[in-house]
């Protein structure tokens, strides 16, 4: 039997030691001091960073939000019932990330990107940070391409462009979600990817929205991020940022995306709850001092970015394409009070607002868009040419009608011109009505606007304006399908299209079939 001498043994041991590769892990650990209402106070964690993920026993994670002199206040992401005083907490050195990419389209996920629709796991190839800095001024482009919502009243009077932030504001149960969901349904063939973020809603309401999107063929290009009312305030606070990161994936690769936040009032309430539990000083309406920043840093991420930005981001893989993320935040008001704290904040951040009014909704005007208060600050440059040309008199007609209607209640005998204006206003108001889940194409909208603008509705009874419009569109779909296809394709308005629409409407009116 061969014997090793001591020098050989020491050489072998030395060689093994040199080859041994043990990465030393310096772990920053702390101890849980208290757990209450989803807020954990931790003693230690000297090197923790703001927003860093903290690991608790049992695979539960939290997020550091308060960095105090001798303790750290963290919010638990998920169930906190298993945590107790004296347990260990570890720094991870990571910030919160969620899965992103086309694999999420057609799925319903929670605020952390985990699937909750029972369709199996999501095999996302990439993840991205939930909190990101918005693109700088240099990388942005002005808004000049439209997002068609499919609503006449919005596309004609308050147009939305790609990369714009357009607020939808109004009381509860007034059609805010309906308007936003219809805008998503209208994108099913436009190539715009959509993200619907539900914050603090009933699970039955979210399930209903998902079902409607599926029925109308729009779920395949939509990601639904749900943080329902039964989930923790932390997840309701994070959901909009997670959804925004998922939408930015498409923006940064030269594609167009649309995101709906339904609604940011509930996110502000969730953030107020977290802040008060963290013992931060309350301000107006008990909201913390940084509630404006809460929404501004979210909404500034919606933008239209230049070709150079996309090229730089994709390392030259995508060239000559701009990307955009259009935001439709929703805010719920109390008794129409737009001067409350959160509504005024969001109005000042966004590029315009669509104001829905209870009185109009209750009188049967749906969508209940108040054309007087609603405005789009940048969408005009993005409006489709034919809609822009034909919708000029619509807003004026409605504004004059509302003014005269109030005046007409007191005056018994009206002159001919005033009476005509009133009747025209009534017909336009009737024409602006639209059923839910029935978005209109550019060509269909153009027919309605042309009929109103060129006086073809003057001899139509006010009660029959709706049926006249339906019959007119059906007639054109049968007899002038090529003209409609041409309008939808180009969106231009010239003498040839003008003559085509005029001749078609005149022939239709001769049939008297409405």
UniProtKB/Swiss-Prot annotation:
It catalyses: ATP + H2O + 4 H(+)(in) = ADP + phosphate + 5 H(+)(out). SUPFAM superfamilies: C-terminal domain of alpha and beta subunits of F1 ATP synthase (SSF47917), N-terminal domain of alpha and beta subunits of F1 ATP synthase (SSF50615), P-loop containing nucleoside triphosphate hydrolases (SSF52540). GO terms for molecular function: ADP binding; ATP binding; proton-transporting ATP synthase activity, rotational mechanism. InterPro entries: ATP_synth_asu-like_sf, ATP_synth_asu_C, ATP_synth_asu_C_sf, ATP_synth_F1_a_nt-bd_dom, ATP_synth_F1_asu, ATPase_a/bsu_AS, ATPase_F1/V1/A1_a/bsu_N, ATPase_F1/V1/A1_a/bsu_N_sf. Keywords: ATP synthesis, ATP-binding, Cell inner membrane, Cell membrane, CF(1), Hydrogen ion transport, Ion transport, Membrane, Nucleotide-binding, Translocase, Transport. Belongs to the ATPase alpha/beta chains family. NCBIfam families: atpA (TIGR00962), PRK13343.1 (NF009884). Produces ATP from ADP in the presence of a proton gradient across the membrane. The alpha chain is a regulatory subunit. This is ATP synthase subunit alpha.
